[in-house]
Amino acid sequence: MSEVKVYRVKGEMLISHDRYPEWRKFEVYVRALKREHALEKVYSDLGSRHKLRRKHIRIRSVEEVDPGEVEDLNIIRLASLERFVKTG
């Protein structure tokens, strides 16, 4: 089974594209098996949270990082799990 890695994704997103367009920077930590999966997760999350299309999101860099460098508490807690059991 593959090991889940932590990626830091940096980029810009276009906020309020119809009235006063403004490009804002973002930095997100994502857990994924591959770089491509991390990109898809970022596109999906930003698109659903901010109602953005993919053309309104510019990815500048995707880096694999050590779990010790992560600042997001949710990612830290997920990384510390040894196993995950889904019930129901």
Swiss-Prot record:
The entry lists its GO molecular-function terms as: large ribosomal subunit rRNA binding; structural constituent of ribosome
- What biological processes does GO assign it? translation
List the Gene3D superfamilies: 3.10.20.10
Q: Which UniProt keywords apply?
A: Ribonucleoprotein, Ribosomal protein, RNA-binding, rRNA-binding
Keyword Nucleotidyltransferase among UniProt keywords: no
Q: Which InterPro entries match?
A: Ribosomal_eL20, Ribosomal_eL20_dom
Domain of life the protein comes from? Archaea
Question: SUPFAM superfamilies, per this entry?
Answer: RplX-like (SSF160374)
GO cellular component, alphabetical, reads:
ribonucleoprotein complex; ribosome
Q: Spell out the subunit comment.
A: Part of the 50S ribosomal subunit. Binds 23S rRNA.
Question: NCBIfam families, alphabetically?
Answer: PRK00773.1-1 (NF001981)
Family, according to the entry, reads as follows: Belongs to the eukaryotic ribosomal protein eL20 family.
Official protein name in the record: Large ribosomal subunit protein eL20
